[in-house]
Amino acid sequence: MSDYSPIWPGLLGDPNLTLVTDPRIDPRLLEAMGTLDFDEVEESSTLSSNPSYKECVEFVAAMEASAEPVYAKKFGSLPPVLGVTRRSEVIQGVDGNEIQLIIHEPAEGNRPLPGILRTHGGGMIMQSATDPQYMRLADELAATGMVVVNVEFRNGAGKLGDHPFPA
């Protein structure tokens, strides 16, 4: 019989690990993240190993709410991106739902420009195209001379509402 005992990575091997203490994280990423005050974000989960749909939706909403002040602090302290304008348009979705488009473009944009269609992060369950980290990224990209269309889509949970797949 073998005495082999696997060493599991991450929380499987050490349930006390956090994002900051996990030895697998690239030190450069850890250094960059150090400015985000991750101590402000709750790291423990109250979810069981088999949560109900309602518990999952509530958990996602709580996660989103706990991260918002971190992003607001980080990106709210940056100077505005100059030479960029923003406007909002609403289009009709296939279900008759309204879809907000936030259009970021160079202030001097009366000419054909390259563009990108950008969807925000959050795994299609939380966050918003108007969150400061996504607005900043779109402004930075627009400042390089392109049009950026940030799409606000229905999430599976969080502040934009509970819209189960396929929303």
Model-derived features: positions:
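Short strand-connecting beta-turns/loops that link adjacent beta-strands
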Residues: 96, 108-110
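A fold-wide structural signal in alpha/beta-hydrolase
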Residues: 142-149
